């Protein structure tokens, strides 16, 4: 069962519809009780780093989420801001992230992206998988394209945690992984068959 954490941010319906079309069992969890039987977890998110963490805390699901991911090693993939809150800190906010993949979230201008490039980085972009993704990008090694909408990127403390890169003025990590925790900066639920393949791969990890 794929469980999508519904804490008030993200395209929950889009994930559910995509999994339904693939005949993969999926549900939304709005409470800790609904999260309890999760075998795979999708942690979506849009908006701001601090706001996402505040809503996750307010949902009452964070303690059980930590228990399942950190203690029980249940696979989880964070999407967009759901990926960013996997980090320790963000230049966008003051709060402490989940810290599941050590690193910091930086603004694109921090890596000297030319001012001629508009922000947010919005639209389709090529993605280059790297070793270590443990199958998340299976079948997507060539010609993978995903939909992005963001102004911040994930800077891993350990470069080995990067499992895919994209380029927007300069290369940046668009997917990360450590153990049973993955994060993708792009939106697989908006990325048509590329996104469907990635979400199916996650269901089969």
Indicate residue ranges for each PLM-predicted region:
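An anion/phosphate-binding loop that grips the pyrophosphate of nucleotide cofactors and donors
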Residues: 38
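Acyltransferase
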Residues: 184-205
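N-terminal beta1-alpha1 ligand-phosphate binding loop
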Residues: 2-24, 188-189
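Short, surface-exposed beta-strand/loop micro-motifs that present aromatic residues
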Residues: 170-177
């Amino acid at each position: 069962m794929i469980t999508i954490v519904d804490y008030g941010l993200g395209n929950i319906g889009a994930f559910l519809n995509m999994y339904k079309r693939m005949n993969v069992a999926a549900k939304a969890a709005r409470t800790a009780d609904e999260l309890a039987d999760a075998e795979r977890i999708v942690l979506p998110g849009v908006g701001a780093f601090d706001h996402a963490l505040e809503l996750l805390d307010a949902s009452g699901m964070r303690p059980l989420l930590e228990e399942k991911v950190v203690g029980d090693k249940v696979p989880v993939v964070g999407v967009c801001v759901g990926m960013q809150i996997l980090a320790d800190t963000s230049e966008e906010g003051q709060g402490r992230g989940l810290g599941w993949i050590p690193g910091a979230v930086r603004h694109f201008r921090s890596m000297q992206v030319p001012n001629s490039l508009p922000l947010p980085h919005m639209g389709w972009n090529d993605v280059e998988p790297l070793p270590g993704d443990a199958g998340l990008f299976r079948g997507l090694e060539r010609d993978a394209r995903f939909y992005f909408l963001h102004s911040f990127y994930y800077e891993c403390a350990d470069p080995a945690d990067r499992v895919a890169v994209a380029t927007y003025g300069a290369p940046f990590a668009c997917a990360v992984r450590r153990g049973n925790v993955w994060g993708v900066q792009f939106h697989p639920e908006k990325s048509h068959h590329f996104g469907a393949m990635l979400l199916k791969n996650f269901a089969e990890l």
